[in-house]
Amino acid sequence: MIKGVGLDLCEISRMEGKLTDERFLNRFFTSDEVSYIHSKGKCAAQTLAGLFAAKEALAKALGTGIAFDLKDVSVRHDEAGRPGYTLSGRAEQLAGGDRFHLSVSHDGGMAAAVCIREGEE
């Protein structure tokens, strides 16, 4: 059963200046995510915007707002490049064992993320 849907948009140009802001990066992203962002070269700002939007979309799908440390939500990619979440801490508690599906896209200077929360009633 679908229990929640979250959608977030993030302006890519807003994130360009954040690529070298270690305080920002370390506050909101895991070390693996920061490494992933920096590995994207010319696409680093769009990757950063997509990851940030993905975290915000999860908060909306949970229906709690940001009631957890954003580093408790790690966006990862499988072997085929599909994005997904690894939750820990308060985010994992709020999820209550539910599953989350994530889609991220970039176009027209924007990054968009959709998160669908699936679980039992």
Where in this protein do the model-derived segments appear?
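Core catalytic alpha/beta fold that binds nucleotide/phospho-ligands
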Residues: 1-121
